[in-house]
Amino acid sequence: MKTKLMIMMLAMLTLTACNNDDEPNSRPDVSLENIYLAVSSTEEGIGDRVITAKGDIVYQCDSLTWIRRFLADGRDWYAVVYNYNGGCQVIKNGNIIYSSHEEEIVDMCVDDGNIYTLQEPFPVPVRQEWLCKNFTHIYTLPYEQFKSSQMVVHHGDVALAPSYSREACYWRNGELVAMQGLEGDLLSCYIDTDGDDVLIGINVDKNNRTGYWRNGTYNELENTIIYQVKLIGGKSYILGNRYTTDVTNQYHGSARRITADAIIIVDGQEQVLRTGDRRNLAYSMIQYNNDNYILVRELLQEARDVYETVTLESKSFIYKNMKPMKLGNDITKLDIIDFAIIDK
C-alpha cells in the first residue's frame, strides 16, 4: 500500500480546496452524495478512485496512476493524478484538462475560476520551481533560498509555505516575507492567510521542534506532527496528531511502536478527535455551511526491527463538528487520501 504519510511527502500533499471556506449561505445541505472521497487502491492492477461517501464510484484511475491532490470548487472536482512511469495529469469532473511528462505538480488551488499550480521539472535536470496560473508560468521561485510545499489562494492573493527555507520566511505574491521572531532553516510547513492574518504550521524549526507561527508569535508543540492549518472567522485551526513512541526489545532487536491521538488546536485550545492504540491523525478540514468537516485517518503500525517490517492498515473517518459521521458501507475501511464537498 502506498503510505503517502511521510512528513516530506505530506508537505507536498496537503490541503483540500483553497477557496471553499467562504460564502456558505447559498450552499445546499450536505449529504453523503456530495461528499467526494479520493481513495487509495489496495488491489494489484487497480488504480486510485474517486467515490462518494455513500460508496458510489465517480471516477476510476488507470492501474499505473495514483491521486496526489484532490479538491473541489463549487460543482466541480479536481484531481492531480501521477503516473508511476513519470508525468502527471489534472482531472476535472472525470476529464483530462492538463497533461505533462516534463513537469510535475506539487500543489494546486482553484480560485475565482482560475487554476493555480506549483510545478517543477520532471525528471529533474535542474533545481527549478514555478508558480503557474492556468498552467502558464507566472513566477520562477527562488529555489536556492526557498522550496515550496503548499499554497493557498484567496481572490488572487497567493501565499506559499516552505518545505524548506534557508531563513525563516514564506512567499507571497512574488516576494519572500520574513517571519518576525523566527530565524534559521524551516522544514515541512503549512500556511493559510486571511488578509494580513497569516498562520504557518512548522514541523521542523531550527531546534528540530514543531510549532505554529501567527503574525509574529510562535508557539512550540510537544510530540506533534502538523498536517494542515486554517484561518476561519478569525480563529486559527491546527490539525495533526500528538504521538508517543515506545521502544522495546523483541527477537533480539530494537522495536518501535508509535501511537498517536488525532488532535485539532483551535485558538490554542487542544481537542482530541480520536485516540486509541493506533496512529491517528487529523488530516484535512473543510468548513461548509458553517459546519466543520475533518478527515481523520487511522493507521495500525507494527513494530520494526531487524526481523520484521512495518505493516500499515488504514481506516478513515469524516467528523462533522467533532463527531464521526455515519458513512456508506465499509467506507471506514478505505484509505482516504483526501475529501471534498461538491455543491449539488
Predicted feature residues:
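Sec-dependent signal peptide recognition
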Residues: 2-8
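C-terminal motif of bacterial Sec signal peptides marking the signal peptidase cleavage site
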Residues: 14-17
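An edge-strand/N-cap motif at the start of beta-rich repeat modules
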Residues: 23-63
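Short beta-strand elements that form the blades of beta-propeller/WD-repeat-like
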Residues: 33-43, 76-83, 113-121, 157-163, ...
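Structural motif
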Residues: 44-50, 85-90, 123-130, 165-169, ...
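A short beta-strand motif characteristic of beta-propeller blades
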Residues: 56-61, 94-100, 136-142, 175-181, ...
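Repeated scaffold domains used in trafficking and secretory/extracellular systems
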Residues: 63-74, 102-112, 145-155, 184-194, ...
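Blade-level signature of beta-propeller repeat domains, shared across WD40, Kelch, NHL, RCC1
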Residues: 314-344
